[in-house]
Amino acid sequence: MQFSKMHGLGNDFVVVDGVTQNVFFTPETIRRLANRHCGIGFDQLLIVEAPYDPELDFHYRIFNADGSEVSQCGNGARCFARFVTLKGLTNKKDISVSTQKGNMVLTVKDDNQIRVNMGEPIWEPAKIPFTANKFEKNYILRTDIQTVLCGAVSMGNPHCVVQVDDIQTANVEQLGPLLESHERFPERVNAGFMQIINKEHIKLRVYERGAGETQACGSGACAAVAVGIMQGLLNNNVQVDLSGGSLMIEWNGVGHPLYMTGEATHIYDGFITL
């Protein structure tokens, strides 16, 4: 099997062309390949497939390192766009793709930046999914070690966002797993820890569902900004600093799509026998 190793701000991926080669992965195979000592090593496996809808260009599948399939990965979407361009699978600048939960448009810019239309944030608890009687800007979540206020939103995958004073001292290692598996998120959740620098600048750490803390999480950056805007804490254009680098997030509020812009880096191509 041919593959490419790529990363978006340090969030690393193996990307596989499922258009020109036949590929099939069991959860066990994915876990073996994801092992950084005995396999290739990655946060997520991305598969490019032929479109399910003839009006679109591709179908986009995402698997976490634990073998579970998920519906969205923002950093992966940028790498997906870079991959299909580099491999000559398309020459379009605006690339339309479907995912498990909806469609996206990926725009390849001339400065190595990829702009992703992430669609509208989803706030209705049942659609996140999140257990709550109604939408609120803040929810109280109780864990074994701490009670927190969080915003909850779906960007095609579920996110909770907790505001902290300092992301360097935030208890991500202990609180992250407890939030990820919290009973009020029946499909588990990506837990974001957001430090607000000013209305146009935040710092963020994300404990990802099925992957643990990563260098960057694109959909997590989108979720954090969306929550911050809904809570009246942020403006419409926000720089998000993650440990792997920065993203620009734009959102004009309810009824509008959210946009993420950032880099996508090709590291190397390889071949492995499954």
From Swiss-Prot:
PROSITE patterns: DAP_EPIMERASE. One of its GO terms (biological process) is lysine biosynthetic process via diaminopimelate. Its main location: cytoplasm. GO terms for cellular component: cytosol. The record marks 159, 208 as: Could be important to modulate the pK values of the two catalytic cysteine residues. It catalyses: (2S,6S)-2,6-diaminopimelate = meso-2,6-diaminopimelate. It holds the Pfam family DAP_epimerase. It is found in: Cytoplasm. The record marks 268 as: Important for dimerization. It comes from the Bacteria. GO terms for molecular function: diaminopimelate epimerase activity. The keyword Ion transport does not apply. Belongs to the diaminopimelate epimerase family. HAMAP family: DAP_epimerase (MF_00197). PANTHER family: DIAMINOPIMELATE EPIMERASE, DIAMINOPIMELATE EPIMERASE, CHLOROPLASTIC. Homodimer. This is Diaminopimelate epimerase. It comes from Haemophilus influenzae (strain PittGG). The lineage of its organism: Bacteria, Pseudomonadati, Pseudomonadota, Gammaproteobacteria, Pasteurellales.
